[in-house]
Amino acid sequence: TKGVTRDGGRTLPLMPYGPYSGMAQEDLKALIAFLRTLKPVRKPTPELQTSVPMLRSIAAEGWLKAFGQFFTSPATAPKSGIERGKYLTEHVAICGDCHTPRSSIGVPNRSMYMAGAGKDIGPLGELVPNITPDKETGIGTWKREEIADLLITGTKPDLDYVRGLMYDVIQGTSHGYRNMRREDALAIADYIKSISAIKNKVK
């Protein structure tokens, strides 16, 4: 939740530890408990290749000071309703990490929250859709149940199926969004339907 490595270094914010800093203590403990059930794998992590390694740490600190956003971790998470959906969206599923456009140096444009990103700025060069409630360019015509269905099954209202990174997060490796409780998927849907509608045709 702070991006600090075991040797005290700071990782680049490619790992979204800023949003994760708002995850509830009870959920962090559950996540760690789950990770400790996995079979150990001995595999060294390759060093990130930069021309001057020292600059990587300096750049990370500078970026975080200028643009980083950290949160206070609550003891427990909201249990229901839109507040539950907001918590899951912003600190667990971190939907905005992909669906909010970023600048060339990775700064999220929070005025375009969830409004999608074109292939030139989307993660891994993928087109990321606008999921605000805008009825023309977003998903404002979708019912809450349809949003929940997509999160769990990957199926859109037109019976098409998601692809790319969204498919990956739904399926997961051992677990993914498909394992989400339906009431949590509906809470996320309710929150997404409550955010500002932004007209942004992604291309």
What is each residue range found by the language model?
Residues G3-R10, L38-V41, E90-G125, T137, ...:
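Periplasmic/extracellular electron-transfer cofactor-ligation site
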Residues L31, G85, V92-R102, I147, ...:
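The canonical Cys-X-X-Cys-His
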Residues K43-R56:
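Extended, well-folded interaction surfaces typified by the phenylalanyl-tRNA synthetase beta subunit core
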